[in-house]
């Protein structure tokens, strides 16, 4: 396992930046270990899988979790507003960093993650391949 850490600055898109980092570093399989910071614009998909909400108010990143691959990332976040009310959902593009966001990722050397369309869900779902002796195809 390899650990990656990087910092985002004001105006950067949280999701796009994580996805670009994964591609740039050729991370075939990984997870988010930690994400802290503040957003001034939030864009989340709700649990119904359809509704997307955009909120133009400051929110602290309370937690983030997700699977990472060069084939796509699946990330959920919990966010707290100025009244300490917490919301959460599926991270979409246009979650914009206010001041900073500190991201720590773990990369696995014994797995390869990819995504394939699943007709039963309507989404590109995670496909997990275990790599024996750290030898990739």
Task: Enumerate the predicted regions with their spans.
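N-terminal intrinsically disordered, cationic/polar leader segments
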Residues: 1-74, 79-137
